[in-house]
Each structure stands twice: as structure tokens, then as C-alpha cells.
């Protein structure tokens, strides 16, 4: 289908209310797949669909059909974002984004993976696509009634879906977003700046002080059980040969969240640095993989329970979609990211599962020397080798097509190609060519019934995701899934490597190396993107080096405090942890030691922080109280006192943000780069080690802390007066903007939901309870199952009907059996197949 010049009307996300009890349609059947005669979709009071059919194709047809009813514009733009086809409908403002997406990712290899799928896998993707297309055909015939308002406002029609399209929304949302982060060029830029500032030896020491690989004191999901080996950090000899590499082209968004260009070229770099300095790295989707999870076996009133909070971010429509699938090989209920065909947080009454971002290192960048006589060749294994090259044609609304070259070296896709400088940069990805396998592994996980079978199944997962399981008897399982490379000796994974073949990857590590555990002796599994196991090294990601300063301690302490408690008491942890200060536990001992001989004002300030409940709850006027106000000011001063003189003004943007919710936050809130580095440095001193670089310039830590506290007190007194009890800090609202993780519109610009203050919790929260006989479920998915407005501008059904529930830490039940589904249903729709 093509563009619509003057489309009007609005798609009613819950059309079944209008069509009565049995509205029949007659979609076209695809060849080679048996079809049942009908599919039935029930919806409850929140609009959550439950699909009943006889085959895998049928339930996935119903899945796609329901998604199209609820989220058609969001899914259209997700598909275009994943494939780099945004400019085709939104114009040249998105051309730079499309160029990036079309040249940095290997789209042909995804298509080949889909073409090579077994028929059982293809039935699932094709069923989903056919269901989407059936609803789109209806929309095309009844635009005034059914077309979602954003299509009319942006002036184009929804496009047809294929099995390939369904695969790409997974690849774009999981592999491209959660398994492709890389900071190696950022790290190299910082290292070189520090070597220029301090000399080669001290600069290298400072780099290792900020970006280490292993911290013995960092909390782990699998408990420590012995000594930890350390990789010696030796400055790679090839760094002396490495020329200046082109900076990474990261997405830049405006204050509303809309795509505003790339960080390479124009004013994009300055805008990116300003945002990071103000809001911190966790405000940017390329640095903020997040989510939390805790599971406890043998609670007092159940066999076990889990609570998952995937922190995808907050957007309208929601990043999360709830559904039940019943038929063929599937009998499962739950929810998933962006209506992906794999249910990420679900149960089948035998087994429940969930996930968090693993944040392990699956990518490396290699710098390549170009042939000065032919820049389409690079030096590898002693000879000039030609890139694999293919054209990518980008359609641009209202303008001529643009053709760009996609290149691939032996290591991976080429992200930068600079003939004038004689170099290129290629990125190796452990999951490249296997992302569709990752999708199907997750899909078929829903058919497993034991921890052991699930663990075997998860060997097929290729992206770095923490996977959790719980059976109906409350037994717990954990696998740090993904494929991880064998790196050559001398390859520092924090920095770009030589691409001449000397340090290419040497295959993949065996699945036995992946951290995993069943039935841990602790009786619980807890994760907030912390280190999976003691021997597992940190990735190169600048914003997330594993340290003792880790927010997961909040969950660990609270789970330990309610050991043997009820399900309700374990669930209540979610509310407390959503507001708890992430730095307090590390800073209070320093403050109390620093004010032993301090003035009464300083002692009063420390007492204020010591008596504080550590909660960042906003008051009725939209402000935080005296203690959080002081804490934010103190952290700001402390980070400045410790790091500014060492790194300089031009690099301090990397350390400046306190990460507190007085600034708009992204998917989550955690300890800052500066705080992790400072705590790690102090831990080494406490352990009797002499750090290679002195962050405090010979001063006692007490003196630096006291000076920072005095600076905070002086600043607040000048701004708000000397009476501490009246100090206030304005809260940034918690917003659900209408843009996806690339800044692409997924709703109209006025579709913004908000709450007065930030909650450090999942984009959804789900609770699964093991009863011994089955699994009970409840969840909450704000704003709602829908997310678009009517032509009049009024919200449609299920636009935001879970937002209040979410704000109050409430949950809605998720029925499983057909009897319970029918009992809770407020509508039923039957789709006839032929």
C-alpha cells in the first residue's frame, strides 16, 4: 500500500466493542499451512487479548491481528525504524538515521535467516504477518472509522507485513538495541585525552582507574565461591600505530525525545555532550540497558514467586504489550516488548520466565587500513582484501531516492569508511547471522515445562540477556544467555583492535562458560543488571562498569530483610526500591567520618542525611524535600572535586551528571560513572592497595568530602537561605513521550503521559506466583493496551487506563485457563479462516 494524502479518521483500538459478540472475517490463506476454521479473541476490561485457535499459525494470526487493532501506527514505525525506512514516510529529517541503520546493520543476512527457517518457525512469523495484514485490509476499506489518527496526520497508509518484517522488529528491538552497545572509540578518545594531559604512563593509569574489567567487591547474581582471577591490564602496543578514528555516530534527540540528528557532524556532538552532562548516560538509549528481577523460593504463603521490572523506557504507546496465546503448541500468557512474537515475561502454568539486560561484551571494533590505490580494499592477513559491498536504496518522501553503500569486512559491518584518512572501522557482533535463531529460541521457550529443558533451550539464545525461570514448585533457574567471542591474546576488549587479522576472534566460547545456576543455595535470584558471576568481566560500555557501587544492593538487602515473608511483602519491595537513593549507602560512612570535628552546620547536614529514609518521593507541589536536595548538591560537588582537575573541562561532561531525578531520566536510575569509579578507588585503598593514579592528589578523603559538603551547603544557602528544612528541589516529571528508542514518532506529538515524579522501576511490572499446582499471574502495563487518540483528539479505549494503577503500585490479574479468560472477558471476536 502507498501513501495517503488526505487520510482522516481514527482507528478504534477496541473495535470488538462495536462489532458485537461474533464478528467474522475471511482472510486469505497462505499455501502450505493447515488452517482451522476460526480464531477467537477475548478481551478483558483492560483490553488485553487472549487468542484461542487450533494451530500455531492460528494463534499467531490472532496475535498479529490483535496487535494491529491496538498498536498499528506504533508497529508500522517500529518496522521502519528496524529496517531504516523512516524517511520514506517522514521525509529528509530522518535521512541520516536511515543511512546509519541501512549501512551499520546487515539486513540481507536477516532475510536469508528467515528464508532458511523450518516450516514450523515460518508458520509463526507468517501467521503474525497475515494477522496484521488482515486488519490492515479492513482499515483500508474503512479508513474514516478504523485508520489510526497518526497515519492521517503524517499522511501515509500502513504497509503490508511479511514474515521478514516480523523478524526485523525483533532484531531491531533486541539485537540492535540491547546487544550492540559499544564504547570502544569513546574509551580510546578518553584514553588519548588523558595521555596528552598526564603523559602515557599516568594517562593509562587514570584510564584503568575509571574503566576496569573486574571488581572483586561488585555484587553478583551467582554468589562468589572462591578466589577471582584478574586479567592484567597492559597498554596494547598497537595503540601507538592507531590513528585518530572517526567518532561514533550516536543518535541525538531533542528535549521532547524526537530524533534530531547524529553525534558525528554539525552541532550533533555538542548537543550529545550537553545532554550527557545534564542528564547522564542512562538518559540515552544507547547507554541504558536496564531491568530488575527478584525471585524467592518458599515464601510463607506460596511455593515461590518472582517479580520482573523490564526497564525498556517509557513511551506512548507503551513499550510493552500483553497477550495470551492458546492453541497448537502454545498455552501461555504474559507480556512482551513492543508486541514481539516472543513473549519475554510469561508463564505456561508449568514454567514462568523473565529477563533483564545482560550488559556483557558481544561486540568489538576493528580499525582497518585502506588500500591507498583502492579504498574498497583493506589490509588483512598480509594482503589487500575487498569489502563485501552492496547498494541500499533509501526512499525519501517528496525527494529523489538516495543510494548508499553498505560494506562488510571479515570482522563485520563497516561503521566508518574514510578514504582521505586511509582507514575504516568494522564491528564484529557475536549474534550477527544468528539473531533470528535468538528470536525463535525465545518463542519456543514457551513450550518448555522444566528448568532443565529451559536451560537446554537457552543455549540457542545469541543475545546477551539474563534469562530467569521458575517452575510451579518454586524452583528457580538463571542463565546469562548469549554467544560470546574467544578473543586473541593481547586484545583489550575495552578498546578498538587492529583489523589486520592478527587479533580477529577465534570462534565462540562454549555454552558451559555462560554463568548459570539452578536452585541456588541462597533460595533467591536477584539482578539489576549487575555482574552475573564473579569471574565475568565488565564490558567496554562506558556507562556501566561493574563496581561495588551498584543499585542491586537495594534489592539484595530488602529481599534478605523479608526472608520467609509473604508474597505481598516481597512484592512490596518494588515500591520501596523505586524511590530509594542509589548513593546513600556508599556516601554516609564518608560523610560521618569527615564531620567528626566539623562545625555544627556540617554536623546538622550529615544528621539530616543520616535520619532520611533515603526516599525520593515527590511532594504534592512537585518538589523533593531537604534531604534529597542536599544529597544531589553534595554529589554534584563531590564529583567535581574529585574528577574535574584530573580529566579537564573538555572531558568532564562524562562525569558531570549526578543522575538524580531533578533532571529527566531515561529507562532507569543508577549510580553514575563518577560514583562507581570513586567507590572502586576507595575500596582499593581500604584493601591496602595503592591505586596507580591518585584521584585525590594526596589529600585525605575526609578533607575532600568535607570540602564538597561545605560547597553544597554554601550553594544551597545562597540560593534558598540558611534554614535547611525549607530547601527544595524541583522534580522532573516522569513522562511517556510519543517517540521510540531511536527518536522516531510512534504516535502524535501531543500523546504524552506523565506522573509528577520518577519511579525507578519497570516499564511494566509482572508478578508470578508458584502454587505447587500451577502459576498465578498479575501485571501492570502503563499507559494501557492502546495508545492512540481519536480524530477528535479524545483518548480512545485503553489509552491510559493502567497509568493510575501503575502509579499506585497496583496490578491487574492475568487469567490463564479458558474458563477464567471467559469469566473476565468483556468482549469476544471470532475471525473465520478458510
Predicted regions and their residues:
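Glycine- and hydrophobic-rich flexible loops that cap the catalytic core of alpha/beta enzyme folds
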Residues: 327-337, 342, 346-351, 355-501
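Terminal end segments
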Residues: 541-602, 694-834
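Bacterial signal peptide processing site
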Residues: 23-25
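Substrate-recognition/specificity elements adjacent to catalytic centers across diverse enzyme folds
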Residues: 30-305, 310-316
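Bacterial N-terminal signal peptides that target proteins for export
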Residues: 2-11
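Second-shell loop/turn segments in exported
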Residues: 60-62, 109-123, 426-428, 439-445, ...
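C-terminal motif of bacterial Sec signal peptides marking the signal peptidase cleavage site
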Residues: 18-21
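Hydrophobic alpha-helical segments
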Residues: 423, 463-562, 615, 630-633, ...
Amino acid at each position: 500500500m502507498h501513501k495517503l494524502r488526505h487520510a482522516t479518521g481514527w482507528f478504534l483500538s477496541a473495535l470488538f466493542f462495536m462489532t458485537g459478540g461474533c464478528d467474522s472475517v475471511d482472510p486469505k490463506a497462505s499455501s502450505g499451512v493447515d488452517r482451522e476454521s476460526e480464531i477467537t479473541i477475548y478481551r478483558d476490561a483492560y483490553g488485553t487479548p487472549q487468542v484461542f485457535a487450533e494451530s500455531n499459525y492460528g494463534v499467531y494470526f490472532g496475535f498479529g491481528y490483535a496487535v494491529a487493532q491496538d498498536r498499528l501506527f506504533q508497529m508500522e514505525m517500529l518496522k521502519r525504524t528496524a529496517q531504516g525506512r523512516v524517511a520514506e514516510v517522514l521525509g529528509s529529517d530522518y535521512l541520516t538515521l536511515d543511512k546509519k541503520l541501512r549501512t551499520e546493520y546487515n539486513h540481507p543476512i536477516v532475510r536469508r535467516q528467515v528464508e532458511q527457517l523450518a516450516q514450523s518457525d515460518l508458520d509463526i512469523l507468517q501467521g503474525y504477518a497475515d494477522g496484521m495484514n488482515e486488519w490492515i485490509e479492513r482499515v483500508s476499506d474503512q479508513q474514516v472509522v478504523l485508520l489510526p489518527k497518526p497515519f492521517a496526520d503524517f499522511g501515509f497508509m500502513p504497509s503490508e507485513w511479511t514474515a521478514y518484517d516480523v523478524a526485523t522488529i525483533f532484531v531491531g528491538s533486541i539485537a540492535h538495541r540491547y546487544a550492540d552497545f559499544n564504547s570502544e572509540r569513546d574509551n580510546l578518545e578518553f584514553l588519548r585525552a588523558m595521555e596528552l594531559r598526564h603523559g602515557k604512563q599516568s594517562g593509562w593509569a587514570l584510564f584503568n582507574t575509571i574503566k576496569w574489567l573486574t571488581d572483586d567487591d561488585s555484587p553478583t547474581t551467582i554468589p562468589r565461591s572462591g578466589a577471582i582471577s584478574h586479567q592484567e591490564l597492559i597498554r596494547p602496543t598497537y595503540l601507538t600505530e592507531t590513528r585518530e578514528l572517526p567518532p561514533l555516530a550516536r543518535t541525538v534527540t531533542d528535549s521532547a525525545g524526537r530524533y534530531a540528528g547524529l553525534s558525528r557532524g554539525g552541532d550533533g556532538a555538542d548537543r550529545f555532550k550537553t545532554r550527557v552532562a545534564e542528564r547522564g548516560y542512562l538518559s540515552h538509549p544507547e547507554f541504558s540497558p536496564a531491568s530488575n528481577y527478584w525471585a524467592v523460593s518458599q515464601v510463607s504463603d506460596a511455593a515461590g514467586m518472582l517479580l520482573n521490572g523490564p526497564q525498556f523506557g517509557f513511551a506512548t504507546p507503551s513499550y510493552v504489550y500483553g497477550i495470551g496465546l492458546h492453541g497448537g503448541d502454545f498455552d501461555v500468557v504474559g507480556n512482551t516488548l513492543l508486541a514481539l512474537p516472543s513473549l519475554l515475561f510469561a508463564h505456561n502454568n508449568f514454567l514462568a520466565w523473565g529477563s533483564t539486560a545482560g550488559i556483557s561484551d558481544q561486540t568489538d571494533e576493528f580499525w582497518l587500513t585502506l588500500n591507498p590505490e583502492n579504498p574498497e580494499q583493506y589490509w588483512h592477513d598480509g594482503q589487500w582484501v575487498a569489502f563485501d559491498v552492496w547498494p541500499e536504496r533509501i526512499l525519501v518522501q517528496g525527494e529523489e531516492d538516495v543510494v548508499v553503500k553498505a560494506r562488510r569486512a571479515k570482522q563485520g559491518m563497516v561503521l566508518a569508511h574514510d578514504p582521505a584518512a586511509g582507514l575504516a572501522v568494522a564491528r564484529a557482533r557475536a549474534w550477527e547471522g544468528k539473531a533470528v535463531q535468538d528470536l525463535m529460541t525465545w518463542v519456543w521457550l514457551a513450550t518448555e515445562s522444566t528448568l532443565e529443558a529451559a536451560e537446554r533451550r537457552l543455549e540457542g539464545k545469541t543475545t546477551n540477556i539474563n534469562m530467569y525461570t521458575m517452575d510451579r514448585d518454586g524452583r528457580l533457574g538463571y542463565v546469562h544467555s548469549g554467544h560470546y567471542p574467544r578473543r586473541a591474546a593481547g586484545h583489550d576488549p575495552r578498546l578498538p583492535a587492529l583489523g589486520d587479522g592478527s587479533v580477529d576472534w577465534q570462534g565462540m566460547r562454549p555454552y558451559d562458560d555462560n554463568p548459570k545456576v539452578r536452585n541456588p543455595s541462597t533460595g533467591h535470584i536477584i539482578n539489576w543488571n549487575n555482574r552475573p558471576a564473579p569471574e565475568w568481566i565488565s564490558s567496554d560500555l562506558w556507562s556501566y562498569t561493574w563496581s561495588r557501587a551498584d543499585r542491586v544492593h537495594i534489592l539484595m538487602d530488602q529481599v534478605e530483610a523479608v526472608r520467609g515473608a509473604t508474597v505481598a511483602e516481597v512484592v512490596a519491595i518494588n515500591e520501596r526500591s523505586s524511590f530509594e537513593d542509589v548513593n546513600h549507602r556508599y556516601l554516609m560512612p564518608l560523610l560521618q567520618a569527615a564531620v567528626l570535628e566539623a562545625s555544627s552546620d556540617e554536623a546538622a547536614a550529615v544528621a539530616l542525611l543520616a535520619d532520611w529514609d533515603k526516599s525520593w518521593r515527590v511532594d504534592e507541589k512537585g518538589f523533593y524535600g531537604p534531604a534529597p536536595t542536599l544529597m544531589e548538591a553534595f554529589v554534584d560537588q563531590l564529583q567535581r572535586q574529585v574528577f574535574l582537575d584530573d580529566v579537564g573541562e573538555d572531558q568532564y561532561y562524562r562525569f558531570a551528571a549526578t543522575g538524580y531525578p531533578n533532571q529527566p531520566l531515561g529507562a532507569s536510575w543508577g549510580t553514575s560513572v563518577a560514583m562507581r569509579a570513586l567507590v572502586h578507588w576507595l575500596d582499593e585503598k581500604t584493601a591496602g592497595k595503592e591505586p596507580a593514579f591518585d584521584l585525590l592528589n594526596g589529600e585525605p578523603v575526609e578533607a575532600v568530602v568535607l570540602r564538597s559538603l561545605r560547597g553544597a551547603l554554601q550553594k544551597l544557602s545562597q540560593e534558598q537561605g540558611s534554614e535547611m528544612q525549607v530547601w527544595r528541589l524541583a522534580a522532573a516529571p516522569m513522562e511517556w513521550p510519543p517517540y521510540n528508542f531511536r527518536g522516531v514518532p510512534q504516535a502524535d506529538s501531543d500523546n504524552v503521559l506523565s506522573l509528577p515524579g520518577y519511579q525507578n522501576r519497570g516499564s511494566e511490572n509482572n508478578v508470578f506466583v508458584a502454587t505447587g499446582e500451577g502459576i498465578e499471574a498479575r501485571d501492570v502495563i502503563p499507559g494501557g493496551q492502546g495508545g492512540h487518540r481519536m480524530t477528535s483528539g479524545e483518548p480512545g479505549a485503553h489509552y491510559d487506563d493502567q497509568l493510575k494503577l501503575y502509579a499506585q503500585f497496583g496490578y491487574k490479574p492475568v487469567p490463564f485457563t479458558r474458563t477464567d479468560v471467559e469469566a473476565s472477558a468483556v468482549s469476544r471476536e471470532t475471525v473465520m479462516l478458510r
